[in-house]
Amino acid sequence: MSGSTAPALSGKGLGAGYGGREVFSQFDFALPQGEVLCLVGHNGAGKSTLLKALFGLHPVSAGEIRLRGQLLKPRPEAMAREGVAYVPEGRGVFPGLVVREIFQLALWSAKLDGAEAEKRTEEVLEVLPRIREFWTRRAGTLSGGQQQMVSVGRALLSRPSILLLDEPSIGLAPKTFQDLMAPIRALQQRLGMSILLVEQNVGEAFAVSDRVAVMKSGRMIFEGVPDDLSDHAKLMDMF
């Protein structure tokens, strides 16, 4: 990344917690433009809280957040308008709706209709063509991998420049995870999208990441390319 290029998304001196319990403090973070950064760590390290704070779903008690170098106070609606999409842990699909309706609802929420809505839908189905196989099925009848694909596809409808993914591999076999991430990685490289991927499944996530950061007890203890982390036996023993 060029020294003159502002990160896609960054935080400086961030603090956040729950019910008086501090999750992280004085935390600095930067997602480079056009890269996939994988943030790894055990449960309770603060990864998901950071993701929620960056998208405006959890308040920060200290520090500042910048989007493409511009200071802002994140709110989900504003972040979405600025091209940031968030896929939460747990998939968040509506079990009673068929997949087509889930997409239609997302398009309606984004005030997209007619030819533009059809165009966006086709774009996503070209990236994730397996969704066509269960397009008319209720989300509650789908497997975990299929639900995750729907959740990611719904996020891609907005053509985000920044994508935040919270543990997309949960409950997925390694091949299913790779089937999900490979086309997303290809799209990211083609469009220059920036992706922050939060994971515990280190090996699978490294295969689709440009950089990796390790979070432990609310602190960043490593950041570099995946091969560099592989050389740190003590850090790898954490996983």
Regions found by a protein language model. Give the residues of each.
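Conserved structural motif at the start of ABC-family nucleotide-binding domains
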Residues: 9, 24-26
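The feature captures the beta-strand-to-loop junction immediately N-terminal to the Walker
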Residues: 40-42
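Helix-to-loop junction immediately C-terminal to a conserved catalytic motif
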Residues: 55
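Conserved ABC transporter NBD signature motif
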Residues: 63-73, 82, 116-121
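Conserved ABC ATPase signature
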Residues: 138-142
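ABC ATPase C-loop
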Residues: 155-156
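Helical segment within the ABC ATPase nucleotide-binding domain
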Residues: 178-191
